[in-house]
C-alpha cells in the first residue's frame, strides 16, 4: 500500500526531495512518433518550473525531463516563506490564482469587523503554507501540462500515471548522489552522450557559458 503523502514529506526532517512523475500515454514527451514531434512538451515543463519557483518557496536544485517521465530535486525554503509579508503572499498567490476581494480589502486596511480580520489572517497563513507545499507545487505543474497536452492531442482523461513519487533526501551524501543520478539520466538512457548535450537538464544549463556565473546549487531559485 502506498504511503500517505504526509508520511513521505516531512519538512522537519529534511527540506530536499527527489520527485518523479511518469505519463500514462506513450506519446508524452517523445521526440518523433507517428509523424509528430512532441519535443516542445519538455520545454513546457522547464518553463513551468521557472514560473513556479518564482512563486513558491521551493527551489529546483536539479532536473531532467526525459521522454515519458521527469525527475526534479527540490528544496523547500520554509524560512523564506515565514518572512513574507501579507502583501507578498497575496502577490505570489495571485500569479496563478484569484485572490478573494475580502483579502484585498484587508490588505488595504478596509476591514473593520474582528471576525473578518481574523478570517483574512487565517487565509494568509493557508496561502503561506500552500506556497511551501510540494503537493501544491506539483499540482500546479502537472495539471497545467496535462491540460496543454490533452488539448494538443484532442482528447481527455488521465495524462499522468497515478501519484507522483517523492523520496526524502536526508543527508549530504544522498543529496550529491541524487543530483548525479538525475544529471546522468539522459546518458544512461542513451539519448545523450555527454552532460552538456543532455537537453532539458539542469546539468546542461549549468555547463552552458551563459550560466557560468549562476548559483550552481539551484537551477531555479
Predicted segments with their positions:
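Short catalytic/metal-binding and nucleic-acid-binding patches
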Residues: 1-221
